[in-house]
Amino acid sequence: IFSTKPDGKPVLSDKETNIYELDYKEIRSYDVGLRGHSGFPDQNKVASFKPLLSDVIDLISAFRLSFSSKSFGLNIELKSLPFEYNVSQPEPFEFVSLVLKELYLIDSQVNIVLQSFDVNVLQILHSERQAFRYFDVSFLVEPEDDNEIDSNLEKLGFKPDIWSPNFSVLSKTKVDYLHQKGIKVIPWTVNEISDMSQMLNLGCDGIITDYPDRAIAYIKK
């Protein structure tokens, strides 16, 4: 819990306010940067607010113009839970439609990856990309489900571009098996240098990390 109410008082429970019931003006009035996050003690405490996806896209697009590399991409997670449909989030089809609407005008040279743990969301993403500019679909996998690769693929109903498990349950055998199926492997959430090195040795195609500065420094060694 790291948010602050408009009156300066801290938000004490994640159930205290349902932002799905607020308009954006109300959401923006909550600070989400000054209190800091206990999980990231080195993070600078800066006054901030939850931006719109469109604002993030505009910021990234402007930054890309000054970026020397042609390789540039967006990796967006659609956080979704079936028991939260119409409670704290839209139904999957509406959710996906709202996100794709914001992504529609992005330069086609920008690579887009859309990921989720929710199979319903992933299935809609897969069906909708036929009428949309191409993007990769990434299946985020809970640790307890990672040993059931084939049954999860069967449940999903299509071959995702990327398989994203928790890094702690990965093995060389699993990575090789997924590669044989033509599926990239990008585990989450790899924060320690030693674990980054291990994932590289396993043959992973990338990692998800809270510390890109560490990853960049490691790669440059």
Task: Enumerate the language-model features and the residues they cover.
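Metal-dependent phosphodiesterase/phospholipase catalytic core, i.e.
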Residues: 1-136, 140, 158-159, 165, ...
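C-terminal active-site rim and adjoining tail of enzyme catalytic domains
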Residues: 132-221
